[in-house]
């Protein structure tokens, strides 16, 4: 078995730069950035460190082979060539999942069956047995076929890394934790930041911002698939957990305030903050956005209700308009609003300094970024429909 592995960390589009910084910070080597994924190198300790510490990626996978596969024979041979006996014990359970895109082999179930057969044959030959009970630890095998090139991977994470362990329940259409962590990074949240959210929902944006400010590792409250893998010793997990705990900075000046008109959401946000260990830094209250007055030094991170969280588009537009009016009267250090509403700037009443295309799960969104802008006259002028090309023609009058 090699001393170092090639690892893959998929992430949502728009999160790659933040994820690269995180990987550099934990000592990953040979980091390469692609669309929606990063590859890097590291030993067994890196598998533990990456799963425990990465905030913005979806999972960590061990890349076992990359090879051309236009036929089932080629698919089988590429899988059989992997030294599975060094990774999987004789009693391992090994489900196979994957996808195929723009490839000759289009049937995912058929590919799953071929890959499973190849692993079974290799393990039987190398373990000198005719029986594989699959009663032991689960090793999830994943494959990806793209343009007749196959990647075979072993999942080290289990449930996605957005499952932090603190959000037991959520309101409708919550923001994904990994995306919230990326927004906190783009918003330049620091140890002494003051952060506010007028549409806090179940509190995810502020909780992720607090954990970032306090350097609380996101994976401390959960378990990972690779904790049962024989080639990642339990001692490494214990060491990495202890290291993460030691690097936490609980005594910081960070403070966050979240508001929502729904008392149930506020109660849930408070419960989630307590589970996340940031209840002393995050404060949630019932309040209407019409009463929101951002503090001058505040960074506002928010996910305005839209789509599943609103019954009508008109209702969402009205809330965005109200937010714009309140922000015009109470300017702050910056506003970072993530929404699927492509007309947000028109409703809000001001063009963003910068926009970034992102995804909340499978929902395409835009992050609208406003930095230290002067007061402006709020007039919700109509704007032309626009895609992601960044072209805009409407100007808003400034005072």
Label each PLM-derived region with a short phrase:
Residues 152-186:
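SAM-dependent Rossmann-like transferase core, predominantly class I methyltransferases
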Residues 141-157, 368:
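C-terminal edge-of-domain segments
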Residues 175-293, 308-309, 313-317:
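Conserved S-adenosyl-L-methionine
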Residues 45-52, 159-162, 376-378:
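Short, charged/polar, Gly/Pro-enriched secondary-structure boundary elements
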